[in-house]
Amino acid sequence: MDYKINRALKDLLISDIPYAAVLEVKNKEGQTFNLKINYTNIKEITPSLAKEKFVDSQMLDEDIGYLKINTWSSRVNINGQNISDLVEDNLKLLASSKSLIIDVRKNSGGDSKLAEKLAGHFITQPIVYGTVLTRELGHDTLVNQNLCLQPQGDYLDKKLVILTGPDCLSSNEMFIMMLKDTNRAITVGQTTGGGSGSPKSFNIHLGERKFTLNIATWKMRRNNGSPLENIGIEPDLPVITTPDDVIQYQDPDLKKAIEYVHSHLEI
C-alpha cells in the first residue's frame, strides 16, 4: 500500500495539469487532513539546478555522515564535474565520519560505472555482486555473466547504511546490490522498484502516433538467486511511512537508520 501511495503522489507531482491538487489524508485516529499539492513546471526550474539537487551531504553528529545521491546520470555536468566528481567532493566533507548513511531513495539510475566508483571505495578486493543472463548477438545461445565490483581509489573503512525505496531502479539497484548483496551494507526503508533489463529503445509509428518501445537485453539475478525484475530488493530493516509522518514532514527511514547505527554499529 505504501508503494501505491508513493506512486500516486509522484504522479501528482509530475502531472502536466497546471493546477493544484488537494489530497485528503486520514490518520489512525480517524482524523482527516487536507494536503495541497502545487503544480510546478519542471522546465522552469531545471536551468537553476545546483549541485545540491544531485548530491548533498552533512554530518548528522560527530560520528555519522549523511550522503544523498539523486541520480547516477552521465549527462550531469556542473562546471565540468560529473556525478562521480560531486560524490568525491562530498566524501571529503565526511572524512571524519565512522558510519555513513547513503540516501538513494530518489535515484532512478543512470550509469552503473559512476555508481561503481563510489561502491569501490568500500571493498579491498574484487567481488561478484550479481549475474546477468544475455543472448549472444545473432545466436540463440544464452550466456551467464558475473557482475564484478573492483576496488576504486582509497579504501574507506566505514559502517554503511543505505536508504532505499520504490523509486530506486536500474543502475541504482545495481549500486545497492554492490554493497548489500556483498554484506558490506545494510538497507533501511522500502523495497526497490525492481526494474533493470538494460533496455534498448526503438521508435515506432502507428498512424500519426509515435511510440518508444523499450526492449530488455538481459535478465539480472542477485547473489541469492532471486531475480531483480518486478521484485526489487527488499530492505533489511523495513519502514512504513504513516500519514502522520507525511503531515509532520518526518523521515522515518532516516530516523530508523540513525537508531540502528547508534544501537548496533560500533562507533
Task: Describe these PLM feature segments.
Residues 1, 101-103, 179, 187-189, ...:
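Conserved PDZ fold ligand-binding element
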Residues 3, 77-85, 109-116, 154, ...:
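Soluble non-cytosolic domains of exported or imported proteins
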Residues 1-99, 106-108, 120, 124, ...:
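Flexible, low-complexity junctional segments that flank or bridge functional domains
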Residues 109-163, 167, 197-207, 217-221, ...:
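Gly/Ser/Thr-rich loop/hinge elements
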Residues 84-91, 115-119, 157-160, 172-176, ...:
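Extracytoplasmic/secreted envelope proteins and their assembly/folding machinery
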Residues 18-20, 32, 61-64, 95-99, ...:
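Extracytoplasmic
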Residues 100, 169, 182-196:
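Short, well-structured beta-strand/strand-turn elements
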Residues 65-68, 100-103, 159-164, 186-189, ...:
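Structural recognition of the beta-strand scaffold that forms the well-ordered cores
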